[in-house]
Regions:
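Alpha-helical scaffold elements adjacent to nucleotide-binding pockets in ATP/GTP-utilizing enzyme cores
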Residues: 43-47, 123-127, 143
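Short acidic alpha-helix initiation/capping motifs at coil-to-helix transition points
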Residues: 21-22, 116-123, 157-160
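PAPS-dependent sulfotransferase catalytic domain
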Residues: 1-70, 82-109, 175, 179-183, ...
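Short, solvent-exposed loop/helix junctions and linker helices
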Residues: 37, 117-118, 170-174
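Phosphate-binding beta-loop-alpha motif at adenosine-nucleotide cofactor sites
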Residues: 104-131
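PAPS-dependent sulfotransferases, especially Golgi type II membrane carbohydrate sulfotransferases
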Residues: 81-84, 99-102, 129-200
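Acidic, glycine-rich loop-and-strand cores that form catalytic or ligand-binding grooves
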Residues: 65-79, 115, 120
Length: 200
């Protein structure tokens, strides 16, 4: 049934897993867009467990050596110091661009991972409506059943640990959560992520 989902030419059906770029301006402005983001604090927690614990090792010896050195440093830092460094240097500069991208683009549906995880069917229905797709109930139910990102139990040895939203509550120190919420309040607010302040 792919014929009613996809055009054979003229469109790109793929995630853009990097910051918006000027080279893509024309494409971005002239086509409908799905902006799908996870809470950056959970991104940091997930990165720590993935790259620090469970991510498969690269096959080449040179890449494996670099990877293991990075993994050793991450575990030495611990989850709090790593998360702050990772957010400052990698995640939040990109999310700042995405926040601006969201403000400037109208032909766009913005979806938070957290909303998707808690309401898979409702989120998929919204995407179908936004893209004006025709999807029969059988295909829709199949997609919903396969798409849920949440696992029943947290498996610390699995690359996919749990998929549950707001894991940073349990993983990061309260003081760090407050600091991140204050330092990046503009970006978090624009992207509709909660501003947590434990002192209130």
């Amino acid at each position: 049934n792919y014929y009613y989902f996809f055009n054979q030419r003229g469109n790109v059906y793929a995630p853009l897993r990097f910051s918006p770029s000027k080279e893509l301006d024309f494409f971005i402005k002239s086509n409908p867009k799905i902006l799908f983001l996870r809470d950056p604090r959970d991104v940091a927690v997930s990165a720590f467990h993935s790259f620090g614990k469970t991510h498969p090792l690269p096959k080449s010896s040179k890449s494996r050596k670099v990877f293991l050195e990075r993994r050793k440093r991450m575990n030495h830092l611990g989850i709090n110091k790593f998360s702050l460094e990772f957010l400052r240097e990698i995640v939040m500069p990109v999310y700042k661009e995405y926040a601006q991208f969201k403000k400037e683009n109208h032909n766009l549906i913005y979806i938070k991972y957290e909303d998707f995880a808690l309401d898979v069917k409702g989120t998929i229905d919204s995407i179908i409506s936004f893209l004006k797709l025709r999807v029969n109930n059988y295909d829709l139910e199949n997609l919903v059943n396969k798409a849920s990102p949440i696992t029943e139990k947290i498996n610390t040895n699995s690359h996919k640990r749990s998929g549950k939203p707001n894991q940073y509550f349990e993983s990061l120190d309260k003081e760090l959560i407050d600091f991140i919420s204050n330092e990046y309040s503009d970006v978090l607010s624009e992207l509709n992520f909660d501003l947590i302040n434990w002192k209130l």
